[in-house]
Amino acid sequence: MSAALSRVVCIIPAKDEEARIAATVGAARDLPGVELVIVCDDGSSDGTAQHAGAAGAIVVSHKRNRGKAAAVESAVNALGVLEQRDSRLEAGTLLLLDADLGESAANCAPLINPVVTGAADLTIAVLPAQQTADGSAAGGFGLVMTTASRGIAELTGWTPRAPLSGQRCLTRRVFELASPLAAGWGMEVGMTIDVLRAGLRIEEIEIDLRHRATGTDLSSQLHRAKQLRDVSRALAARGAVSGLVKRIRSGR
């Protein structure tokens, strides 16, 4: 294991997560090997940036919302600037976490070891079934998930269990290989395809993580529509056969 690989920097894209970001940052800072947490506040209208900074994260801010992929790239670019200023901060491993994990982010340690030891190039968390705030099951996620999973399978031959999971650990080399990232919510799907096409190793790991699950209200439906748009674009840019979504909707 190289010294650089053993140094882990946690990257957290965040928008309007003031209620959870401090707990997420605090839990991430205590993970083994994590030396730094960088949060990109992606145009929040609340106190996300202030709460993240108070919890010990380095904060990069977008004046307007630019999407998840752009937020991750800005945070990694900020890491590069820090490394130029102080070579002791050089990190060979990145841990990508969603901002709404809260204290459950403390369970992400199993993602790290396979990457820093060289057993895997990219690890992905498989989350348990999620519930909304009122205790009901999360709803309406099937079409996006199925589109992502079938698209990845058609392009690579591998069928993922968690194609949309944002909880990922990877080497800097793998991140650079997958860059520029697919835009917005297509980031994870694009990354998975690019890594597999490069002949690298992906390991999915079951981890007990909890995030703010979406329901079936209008806001949730609009969110999933944006996800489907970005996932479809990421797949199309990588050669997915046109009409995939129509075939899934028709049950083919």
Task: Identify what each model region corresponds to.
Residues M1-A4, P180-R252:
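Hydrophobic helical membrane-anchoring modules
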Residues I12, V25, V34-G43, V60:
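Short beta-strand/loop segment that forms part of the nucleotide-sugar
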Residues D16-D30:
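Short, well-formed alpha-helical segments that are part of the catalytic scaffolds
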Residues E17-R20, S44, S104:
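Donor nucleotide-sugar binding loop of glycosyltransferases
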Residues I38, A49-R88:
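Conserved donor nucleotide-binding strand/loop of the catalytic core
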Residues D41-A49, L101:
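A conserved acidic beta->alpha catalytic loop
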Residues K63-R66, A70-V76, A91, S104-L181, ...:
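Acceptor/aglycone-binding surface of glycosyltransferases and processive sugar-polymer synthases
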Residues R85-G102:
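Short beta-strand-to-loop acidic/aromatic patch adjacent to the donor-nucleotide binding site
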